[in-house]
Each structure stands twice: as structure tokens, then as C-alpha cells.
Amino acid sequence: MDRIVIRGAREHNLKNISLELPRGKFIVITGVSGSGKSTLAFDTIYAEGQRRYVESLSSYARQFLGVMDKPEVESIEGLSPAISIDQKTTSHNPRSTVGTVTEIHDYLRLLFARVGQAFCPECGRPIEKQSASEITDRLLKRPPGTRAILMAPLVRGRKGEYRKLFQQLLKEGYARVRVDGVIYLLEEAQGLSLEKYEKHDIDLVIDRVVLKEEERPRIAEAVELALLRGEGLLRVLYPDTGEEELFSEKFACPEHGSVLEELEPRIFSFNSPYGACPACSGLGYRQEFDPELVVNPELSLAEGAILPWSRGRDTGRSYLWDRLRALAEHLGFDLKTPFKDLPEEAKRAVLYGLPEPFEVVFRRGGKETFRVEVRYEGVIPWLEKRYQESDSEGVREALEGFMSLRPCPACGGTRYKREVLSVKVAGRNIAEVSALPVREALAFFQGLEKTLPPFQAQIARPILREIVERLGFLVDVGLDYLTLDRAANTLSGGEAQRIRLATQVGSGLTGVLYVLDEPSIGLHPRDNQRLIRTLKRLRDLGNTLIVVEHDEETMRAADWIVDMGPGAGIHGGEVVAQGTLEDILKSPQSLTGAYLRGEKRIPVPKERRKGNGKWLVLKGARAHNLKNVTLRIPLGRFVAITGPSGSGKSTLVHDVLYAALAQRLMRAKTTPGPYEALEGVEHLDKVIEIDQSPIGRTPRSNPATYTGVFDEIRDLFAKTPEARKRGYGPGRFSFNVKGGRCEACGGDGTVKIEMLFLPDLYVPCEVCKGKRYNKETLEVKLRGKSIADVLDMTVEEALDFFQNVPSIARKLQLMVDVGLGYMKLGQPSPTLSGGEAQRIKLATELGRKATGRTLYILDEPTTGLHFDDVAKLLSVLHRLVDAGNTVVVIEHNLDVVKTADWVIDLGPEGGDRGGEIVAEGTPEEVALTGSPTGAFLARIPEIAARIGVAAD
């Protein structure tokens, strides 16, 4: 069968649609936000493919896998097992790294176990284990006739007189011994008076031989005996040259005895007790109390500078407080001096305590009453003890607020045991290789085979082939700047998705249905072609790709396009057009076609705003890969921050700028990345970050509760004559508290029924029929509608219904303006897409009283948005700027960048080759620089015309 045939799909807002998709092709599903793209791709096609695969397993296996619900669809034919690669499933496990997720780390472990060379961590000499016969062979490789003395080391660097040892050796029939480098007959050695408290070395002479092939049996016997007496060690002295050699039959340094386990793959895993650093259990960092969070340096100790203790000080009787007072008296500092002005010695003593006890004199009425010896342990040791000993979750959680993550001092953040780090391949240990950017790691492994001896090269060849292939796939999806030891939970959604894409290409499966969610997110236009090549490669292996995407380049590269619409929510859910790119371009109904033909487009503003003349300047930002960057943001303008993936945009804007502003303006507990100075903060009142995180994680939260419009609607219901007669207040109309809600389902509207081998069933509550309220509450009507009817309205219907209530109508109008008119007021938050959640937040912000002194920060706000949605979003953002605010967006979408007043382009590449500002100015000025983004801006006709005119 060469087609996937879908009949009667009715999931969410799909309107009983039927369509056929070609198998083994690259298919793009597009359409406006909320039109049902993800519902068709993920909730219908993927869910059914996954469900059928899981259904084929035993009931025992199914209970561990969590069975998918059967989607609302009559039939789907021609389905293959489905794999979904979406944005949401980034690992939150701190042990996951880029290397473990892509499985490159497993091959690295194998490589180091098979061809790694161990070195002593103490002295750096190579450690090899050799059998007695291998040692004999090595000795016989010396020039024939070389004299050698074979000895067994008995005592190495230990104190003692050793008279009994010499007597015992004499009894056993040995003749000579070497003591501290001098050879004696054992009779003489007995007469030696060794210093009892000095360290000595004693070697037993086993045999004196001449190295030649005829003597092999005698030499072999001496080697075996020496290894037996020396517990696996043999020392050989060549008397003619004075040279010495030490051999070991164990994996140990013969000099320092540093013992290594057998080189097995498991010791190169930081997730196994055999390889993980014992101090941090292989995490690479430890949670420690941070003096900067524990102390407020502006306050004095008397005013409560020590934040965790500030509660106990009021009583004056607090045990801790008495100790602190005693310390102040002992060291002679004043408790009323601000902490920052105390001498360094006093600060250190307050925080870390004093090693010795000190005497305190207690006085009453000016007279000495008694003396007592006191120990002061210090704030941080006291907090650590409290944290370790407390059984209360609450106490531990409160104390964690004063802790921050620090690289583990034992392993330096590498996650491994010291012995593991002493195993090297081509001069690098596993942590050093993992710390290389993918691009450099690829070059290292491509050249590695040539540097290995032939025998090792043969072992390494198949392992290297796998490593090089997988690194190549990471480069192909534009992730050449990542390092293999980068924690997976620090990756953006787009990066995590592309890593999983690279892993899938690496797995080489065929005949699979892949469903992807906007893989182009976070990709600079110049990396797009590499991604498209990877997608086509996955298709050419014999797979079907269904990609939910808005990117024009990806659409033009697809074999088949499905355009959903015509509107969003209840106005969508239909297939407007489908076919090849030519079919879509010819379709008069297709909104996507109109944009692709160039009929509809997002215009470039005629004038760029000049702003209010004030600047926000962040100097010397150095977090992650930033190279001492100075960021200048013109206030009162629409600013776009651009640059290739991994060039440091999010680090600069989120980790440094936002964190620093939130700390200064909002007293937030954020810890900004390192920077030197922040100027111009006085021109701002607040900073607000509007991201795509959900507006609520429970079905009890919805657009009406988030925007605050629900409170006003409840007030209106409470003012109706019927509600007054019954004495109902606004609380009666809440489904979260007892009183008005249906108690059978607790106001959820659904009841969960647990099924053992099937997914939990959520069925509408029998009592309230899914309306969430009890019968009495629903009897109160406002113009013929109950509170449940209002929650079931779309925003557009509600706007019509409440048009005479200005405060409600204004909030609803803003939701229509940001393109959410189709959404139901009571739609549960978890069912909203990221783009929808972000636009609800925007509408809420627009509804606040404007001071015109707010800085808004948005990270890739066009995620999940169609050309038409981008136009709506831009009009909202420009409204915020017109009110005098400043909007900073991190964005790759050129439709957004071209409408900005000011562009700041980071680069020139990603990772260690990024972290600098390569161009800044108006889009026209940046287009002239030829920077990574400038080159693409110069291709936009309106901008090209302007710079062409300017250039003339």
C-alpha cells in the first residue's frame, strides 16, 4: 500500500475530515495557529500508530508503557509504527548529556576500554599489566649479554628496623638483599641498625642473570618467583648502566601502587559507581551553601544580615545569637556595622567559624560574673549540619533557597574518578574528549586511526566508524557547536529535537512513520538547508515524514503539503488544500498559498522608530560562551536579537540581562551570569519575560482565569436578582471551592476511572454532565445564560455577549486582537499550544495600565505561528512599543527581524566560535555589514531597494 488513508477524523476541532497521504514521502502540514495541524499529526496519526504498536504487545508489557487513547477517527489504513520527535520531551535528568542521548558516549566508553592507555595519576608513567612470560620476553629484547639483577620489592617507603625480616629471609635460603639502594649479603644486613623512624626500601635479590636466549628457563623462573614474593611487582637493576625498571603484573603503577581496575566500558561511565566521582556521584556539581545568598551585605549583623537566622534574632535569647555576640566581643567588631564594612577576618569567622575555642566573660551590672569557654562553628557549617540532619522536607526546601550549584572540587566538574581520567587515547582522557565542540571532536576522531599502532587501529576501526557517523549527523542538523558533556536539561526545545532527529538518522531504521513538530525552531536561516538535507536523508532511507511546519523553505522542499484551516479553533479543522507545492500555489482558498505566491506579505515599516533617546547598557557579559560583550539596547524601540544557533543570544538576554534586571527592579531571587555593569536601569519600572511555558498545569486553569476576566464575570453573576435573592456571592460561581461546584467531580467536570491494562478513562461527570457546577448554581442566569454556558463560549461569542460591559469587553477584545477569538473561555490550560499560551500572556500584558517604562523580553515568539499569525503578533508587539515600552525579541524569523527598529546580530558562529556582537543598527544598516543575519536581510526586496538607493 503506497498511501496512508485517513477517514472521519474528529479529534478536538477536526470536522470529520478524510484525506490520503503518500507513504515514503516528506509531508508538511501547515495552517494558522489552532487550525488542527498538531491534532491531525500528533493526536490522530501518531497516536493511532503508537497505539496499534503497543496493542500488539502482551498485557504485562502494556502496563509499563501507558496505552494511548484511541483517537476519534473512523479508520486509518497504511500506518507504520510511529515515532514522534517533538519539542516537549527534553530530559530533565541531570545525568543526561548530549553524549548519552545520542549514544556517542557508549561508543566512547568502548573505545577507551579497548584502546586506552592507562597512566599513573601520581607520576604520569604508563601503567601496563604484563604476565610473567611477557616480562621475560621484554627482558630478552635487551642486547644479548646484558647483566641484570632481578629483585622482589618487599618494603616500599615504610618505617621500621626489619631485623626479623632479614632473619626470616636467611632461614628461607636467600643470599642477598638491597636496602635503601645498597646490596648486602643477608648476614651483613642482620647487623645493620636501621633508623626505626625513617622510611626504608627493601628489595630481595632473587637472581643475578645474563640476558640471553639460552638462559630463558632460568630467567623465566626468577621472574615468576620475584612476582610471587613481590606481590605482583618485579624490580630489575642493570648494574653496568645503573638503570632500573619496575614491572607489574597487575594494572597498577609499580612506583606508587595506584591500582586501576581492568579497563572495562563500565568504568568510563559517570552513571556507574565504578567510574563516577565519589564526591558528587557523577553529577559534576554539588549543591553548597552560597555566602552571597546567605548574607545581605548591606545590613549589619544586628539588623539581620544573616538571612537564614534573621528570624531568631528578635528574642535576643537565641542560642546562635549569643554565640555571635561572643564572637564579636572576642574579635573586637561591632554588630551594628554593615556586613560589607567588616574586616575580612571577621567576615570569614562569622561564615566559617573559628578552629579553636575562645573565652567569653559574662558581666552583670558592669561586674564580671563568670567566664566560659565557647566554640563558634560558623553560619555555613551550622546550615550544612542542619540540612544533613533534618527529616523535614519543608526545612530542607527552605534551606535549599540559600544554596547554589558549584562544580565539584574533587573531580573539577568532569564527573569521573581520578583513576578514570588517567586513561588516555591520543593524549586525551574521556572528559577532555567530551568537552570538545562536536565540530572539533569530529576532526579528532577522523584523524585518530592514523595515530594508533596497527593492532589497536584494527580494534578501534568499527568503533570509530560509529562515532564519526553520529558526530556527522549532529553537524548536519546544525549542532556542531555543542559539546558532548553538555547537560541535556540545558538545551532549548529546538536543539533537543534536532539531537533526537540526528539520533534517529543514526539508527538507520526504515519503514517508520516519523512525526516532527517544527524542527526549524531556533535555527538560523543559513542552517536551514542542512536540516532539510537531514530530513530528506531520513525519507530516502524508506521512511514517511510528517512535519508540522511554518517555515517557507521547508514547505518549498516538501513532496506534499496539507494546508489546514481556514481559521483557528471552531473556524478551522478542515483541509483547505493539499498536494504538491504547485497545487498549493494554484489554490485560491489556501491562505498559505497566498503568502507563498507573494500576494499577501508582512510589510516592512516605512519609518524606523527613533526611540526616546535613552539606552540600557549591559557591560562585560561573560556567561557561557559570551566574550566580554557590551549590549546596548535603545529604549522605546522594537529590538531584535539575532544570530546563528548557539551564538549566545539566550545566554545574553535570559541568563544575564533579564536575571540582572529582575534582581534590580523586581527584587527577584535570580542569579545573573557574570557581568561588569548595568547602566540605564533608572529609565525602567519593570521587566517582563513572556515565554511559551504553559499558563497553568492543571485543567482548573483556563484563559478566563489567567486573564482575570473570570473574576469580573463571577461578580456580574453575583449581582443578578436571582443570585441576590439566594444570597450567592462571587465565590458561589467558582468551580475551585465548595459551595457552587459539583461535589461529585470536585468541579473538574470529569471523573477519572482507573483501568488496569488500559489507559485511565476520563468520563464526563454523571451528576453535572461535565458542566462543573451544581444544579442550584446553574439556575442563576445572566441574559438567559448560566455560568457554564459562558465558559463554553468562544472569546468572539463572549465579546458579543459582554459588549456592554467595558471592563470585560476590553480584555476579550485584546484576546481577539492577538488572534485568539476562536478559543473557548473555559478551555483547560494543558490543552493550549505554546504559541497560544504566549499570546494569552501578551493579551494580559496589553490589558495592564501602561507606564510606558516596561521592558518586554520574548524568546522566539513566532514558534508555532503561521505567516498570518505572525502578522497579528507583530501588530500587538508594535502596540506595546507605541505606548513607549521597549520590546526585545530573540528571533530567526526574517518577517519579524525586518520590521524591527534595531537589530543586534551575534556570531559569527555558534558555541566557542560565537559570543560576540558582529553587527548592530537598523535592519538596513545590518544588511550592509554582510553579517550572518545581514546577508539574509539584504535579500528582502524592500530592504535591498533601500540599501541599493542608499548605496547609489
Curated annotation (Swiss-Prot):
Molecular functions per Gene Ontology: ATP binding; ATP hydrolysis activity; DNA binding; excinuclease ABC activity; zinc ion binding
Zinc finger (C4-type): 253-280, 742-768
Any single GO BP term: nucleotide-excision repair
Family annotation (InterPro entries): AAA+_ATPase, ABC_transporter-like_ATP-bd, ABC_transporter-like_CS, ATP_grasp_subdomain_1, P-loop_NTPase, UvrA, UvrA_DNA-bd, UvrA_inter
Domain of life: Bacteria
Gene3D superfamilies, per the entry: ABC transporter ATPase domain-like (1.10.8.280), ABC transporter ATPase like domain (1.20.1580.10), ATP-grasp fold, A domain (3.30.1490.20), P-loop containing nucleotide triphosphate hydrolases (3.40.50.300)
Signal sequence bounds: none
ABC transporter domain sequence ranges: 309-591, 611-938
Annotated localization: Cytoplasm
GO cellular component assignments: cytoplasm; excinuclease repair complex
CDD domains: ABC_UvrA_I (cd03270), ABC_UvrA_II (cd03271)
SUPFAM superfamilies for the chain: P-loop containing nucleoside triphosphate hydrolases
Keywords on record: ATP-binding, Cytoplasm, DNA damage, DNA excision, DNA repair, DNA-binding, Excision nuclease, Metal-binding, Nucleotide-binding, Repeat, SOS response, Zinc, Zinc-finger
Binding-site residues, ATP: 31-38, 643-650
Principal subcellular localization: cytoplasm
PANTHER family: UVRABC SYSTEM PROTEIN A
Subunit structure: Forms a heterotetramer with UvrB during the search for lesions.
Family indicated by similarity: Belongs to the ABC transporter superfamily. UvrA family.
Functional note: The UvrABC repair system catalyzes the recognition and processing of DNA lesions. UvrA is an ATPase and a DNA-binding protein. A damage recognition complex composed of 2 UvrA and 2 UvrB subunits scans DNA for abnormalities. When the presence of a lesion has been verified by UvrB, the UvrA molecules dissociate.
The name this protein goes by in its record: UvrABC system protein A
Source organism of the structure: Thermus thermophilus (strain ATCC 27634 / DSM 579 / HB8)
Organism phylogeny: Bacteria, Thermotogati, Deinococcota, Deinococci, Thermales
